[in-house]
Amino acid sequence: MALTKADIAEHLFTELGISKRDAKELVETFFEDIRLALESGEQVKISGFGNFELRTKNERPGRNPKTGEDIPITARRVVTFRPGQKLKSRVEHARPVDEADDDGDE
């Protein structure tokens, strides 16, 4: 199961008591700000979570897997995410969801 923007908005509605419309707008604004920062070449640092960074990949040789023909892979910018130490540690020590939900009644 994936966590979606709708799930986050629903959680904000439930936990903070703000309207569903405000919760959805808050989530949209949050992600829009991240997108705009990355588009303008800025790094995005979220304390306790991680960093979103832009990386420039140079042109490199590639190969068409169907024909075997050599083709150049063009240079491009990509977004990378580097998790922070707190996030790494919490994920490393977390129980997988299927284990947490397993109550042994099988």
UniProtKB/Swiss-Prot annotation:
Disulfide bonds: none annotated. It comes from the Bacteria. Residues 89-98 have a biased composition (Basic and acidic residues). GO terms for cellular component: cytosol. GO terms for molecular function: DNA binding; structural constituent of chromatin. Residues 85-106 are annotated as: Disordered. Heterodimer of an alpha and a beta chain. Belongs to the bacterial histone-like protein family. This protein is one of the two subunits of integration host factor, a specific DNA-binding protein that functions in genetic recombination as well as in transcriptional and translational control. This is Integration host factor subunit alpha. It comes from Tolumonas auensis (strain DSM 9187 / NBRC 110442 / TA 4). The gene is ihfA.
